[in-house]
Amino acid sequence: MSPIPERAKLHIAMVVFQTGYAGNHVIMRYALNLGVSKLVFPLYRTIVAFSVLAPSAYFLEKKERPAMKISFLIQFFLLGLVGITLNQGFYIFGLDNTSPTFASATENVVPAVSFLMAALLGIEKVEWKRKDGIAKVVGTIVSVAGSLVITLYKGPTIYQPSLNIVNQTIKPEEAEEENKNWTLGCLCLMGHCLCWSSWIVLQSPLLKKYPARFSFVSYSCFFAVIQFFGISAYFERDLERWKIISGGELYALLYTGLVGSAMVFAIQIYVVERGGPLFVSAYLPLQTLIAAVLATLALGEHFYLGGLIGAILIMSGLYLVVMGKSWENQALCQQQQHMISSAASDFGDEEDYHNNKPRSPISQPLISS
């Protein structure tokens, strides 16, 4: 038995998830500045993720993998389309026309959208009159508010690093503003958030029918590779755009493929299965905080009062959501214990009735044999 409690594993997994994905925004922006194809790069990224996930699924889930059905294949195809192909496509076009900070900030609507979708579909139970339901709703709102504070309010500088760990060679974004379509970027990022929310929520019911997690994400990646290849082959006819021509592009590809896709997909589906879709989406605002801290430590950017206030709100919101889930589990356990006690009591009453039932005064048969 593992010395680490199950709930602690979920929290650690989501912190690792958000830390890795916070760097994904900066790495993707770097790759776009290098001039990678916005269609071919996601294809290569998904191939890298698939090449890691598929062997894991084959060797680790040989005996656990359920028999494949046509209905499963259709659902995996749709999950690959919504959760990977459209999700990454909208994201990369949105990031190309906005900025990493803005892209990270818009993703903070995912908890609210996921929560609403899960509640409407009955996947996430919300008891509005109980403290656990109120805590989950308020916690989600507070976390989103904290991430918006980090994005929209700077305030005075409270920490100024003495040196930059990373020497920035990327040209300032202001120099590229004339090439950006901000409206298109916002619309694409809205599509990205809607796809991500749908992906998180729709994984939960299918996982109950197909609980092999690595196989689950491998099939989704497989269909996404086919979809990306078809789209790229049709729209990207220049073979030069299919080449990886620099070490920077290769580094960006490996990071986004191994960390931004393979690791993120594996952790996400693990936590969706064990903690539910709300648990996954509730941690997304933490990404904005981590991105701000990484920018301060690695790029020498100032840390502002708004970042501190936002951090406090995000952590408070996460605490409320976690406590809400804990109270919900306690309520479920109490309900189960009450049902068991009631059933045992009913069984005992029936047993007493049979034991104490009046016996017939006739001790001999009416007709002798």
From Swiss-Prot:
Chain spans, region Disordered: 348-369
InterPro entries linked to this entry: EamA_dom, WAT1-related
Bilayer-crossing regions: 12-31, 39-59, 72-92, 103-123, 133-153, 182-202, 214-234, 252-272, 278-298, 303-323
Record key words, sorted: Membrane, Repeat, Transmembrane, Transmembrane helix
Subcellular location: Membrane
Highest taxon of the lineage: Eukaryota
Membrane topology type: Multi-pass membrane protein
GO cellular component: membrane
Pfam family for this entry, one: EamA
Primary location group: membrane
A GO MF term: transmembrane transporter activity
Domain (EamA): residue spans on this chain: 24-150, 194-323
Family, per entry: Belongs to the drug/metabolite transporter (DMT) superfamily. Plant drug/metabolite exporter (P-DME) (TC 2.A.7.4) family.
PANTHER family: WAT1-RELATED PROTEIN (PTHR31218)
Protein name: WAT1-related protein At3g53210
